[in-house]
Structures are given as C-alpha cells and as structure tokens.
A protein has these predicted regions:
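Hydrophobic helix-and-loop "lid/oligomerization" segment in the mid-to-C-terminal part
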Residues: 1-70, 90, 141-273
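Short, ordered loop/turn segments at secondary-structure junctions
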Residues: 17-18, 45-48, 76-77, 99-102, ...
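Short alpha-helices
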Residues: 28, 106-157
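Hydrophobic/aromatic ligand-binding patch that stacks against planar heteroaromatic rings
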Residues: 32, 83-86, 136, 154
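Short hydrophobic/aromatic-enriched beta-strand-loop microsegments
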Residues: 40, 93-96, 112-114
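Amphipathic alpha-helical transducer elements in NTP-driven molecular machines
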Residues: 81, 106, 127-130, 134, ...
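Catalytic PLP-binding core of fold-type I/II PLP enzymes
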Residues: 84-103, 160
Length: 273
C-alpha cells in the first residue's frame, strides 16, 4: 500500500508521538519514504491540545485540508479506534506501526505492524517504536538501513525498553553511528550538552540527549524535533537545538520547584515507615 501511494503520488501523513521514541520513529519513516520519492509530511501531536495517540480532529484536518490519502502511524495507533475508523470511513487507509500493549480488540486499520501482533510470530517482542519503524524502513528499502541506527539507538534508550537481545544489538551499532553522525541537529545537541561525538554512551543518550527531546514534547510543540533530526540547514539546526536546550533547562527548574515543594510537605520529625 505504501509503494502504491508513492507510485501514484499520494500525500502521505506520518503521525507520530511527542516523546523521543515517537520523534525518532517518525524521522526514520520520513527519511525512508523520501528515499523512495514519497510526498510525505510528519505530524507529532501536541500533548496539550491533541492528547496522546491518533486524534480524529487532526486526521480530519489533514484529510480535508491537506489532501492526505494514506496515514502511517509510528509509536502509536493500536488504541486509536475512533480516529482510524473516521479515516477509513473517509476513504483513507491507515497503517499502524506500534509497540505498546495490544488491546483485546484491534482497530480496523489497513495493516498493523507490531512485534506482539497475535497473527505474527516475530521472535523478539520488546522493540521500541523506533525499532518497529526501522523494520518497516528496511522492508521498504529492501536492505538494512545502517545510517538510521543512530536514531534507533536514541529512541530505544529513551523509551527504557529492555536492552537485551535485538535491542542490545540495535543500540550497540546505533551508538557507533552516533559517534560519527552526519546529522547536524544531533551534532548541535551534543555540542550544547558538552559531549564529544566519539564519547557518546548509553548513559549520555539516556541522561543528556533523550531528556532534551522529551522536554520539548512535554512543554511545547514537538514538531521542530523532526527538522532537527532530519534537516540539513546549519542555522535552523542551531536555533532548534538552542530552543530545545532552553526547554530542558525550564524542565529542570520545574522539577526542582516540585522537589522543593514536596520537601516542605514532609515533616522532618516523622519517621518514614
């Protein structure tokens, strides 16, 4: 169905999530589809106005106003019955790629790509959303896309899935790719975090890179992250990385204020049971 959409010049919407896994997942699919010549755009929902997962109003807007005729979800979708039903009723196919817990009743999507799908026998069930997106990318391009593994490593570590089995391999090679990444946005982020590219580890991703991306999704519009991760404009990458850095500082201030407030609620004379 995706190949058909590309061949016929259809407008494809990649609908992601506002966390680091969703951002990297969407970037992976975007780059893969564009390699095949697709007309596609990415939308990451705003947690304050759109909520989590497929949003019927957003789907309707893109179908009616942007002429979208195929929607591919990444890192969400298995619980999006209402939005997917709306899209299908409007003649728009939805392909779900997700890794979250499977509901008893699955949405009536065109296809569902999920490591725990009851009709599949995929041997490793604990992929992150970006891992599932990477599998889709490899299938579409008919070869392993090693240049995408830096994004896979970030999303997998950020989502705190089990770093065993296939995830361990994806992260290992992804960290190697991060060590000499050509993504100017990641280079800017590493620079602002004071991390040399060749010193990137699981810890630096988990405690420096992932929190920055997550801060954007938690406090503001997450969509600039796509331009950061996939763009080629040095000035734009610097501006977005700086904005994300500032959002992360804001996040830390909020966390600290909550901590200080919580401390005032605790009676120091009272023993914890």
């Amino acid at each position: 169905r995706i190949r058909q959409a590309i061949e016929e010049g259809e407008n494809i919407l990649i609908y992601g999530d506002y966390d680091a896994d969703g951002m990297t997942s969407a970037s992976i699919v975007k780059e893969s589809l564009e390699q095949l010549g697709a007309e596609c755009r990415v939308y990451l929902p705003n947690r304050f106005t759109d909520g989590y997962g497929p949003n019927a109003s957003v789907y309707k807007y893109f179908i009616e106003q942007e002429g979208v005729s195929l929607i591919v979800t990444v890192d969400n979708g298995v619980a999006g019955h209402e939005a997917i039903e709306l899209a299908q009723s409007m003649g728009v196919d939805v392909i779900v790629t997700d890794h979250h817990s499977m509901p008893e009743i699955l949405p009536d999507a065109y296809a569902i790509v999920h490591p725990e799908h009851p009709d599949a026998d995929y041997p490793f069930k604990k992929l992150a959303g970006c891992g599932v997106a990477f599998k889709l990318a490899c299938a579409l391009l008919e070869e392993v896309q090693v240049e995408l593994l830096d994004l896979v490593a970030i999303g997998t570590i950020a989502d705190m899935v089990s770093l065993t089995d296939e995830n361990r391999i994806l992260v290992q090679y992804g960290l190697e790719m991060l060590g000499h990444t050509q993504r100017i946005g990641l280079q800017e982020m590493l620079d602002m975090a004071g991390i040399a590219a060749n010193e990137v580890t699981e810890e630096t991703v988990g405690f420096q890179i992932a929190p920055r991306l997550n801060a954007l999704g938690r406090l503001d519009d997450p969509n600039p992250a796509i331009d950061l991760l996939t763009g080629f404009d040095d000035e734009e990458a610097h501006e977005i990385a700086l904005m994300i850095h500032q959002k992360n500082e804001e996040r830390k201030e909020i966390v600290q204020s909550i901590y200080e407030e919580a401390k005032t609620m605790v009676d120091p004379e009272k023993k914890v049971q």
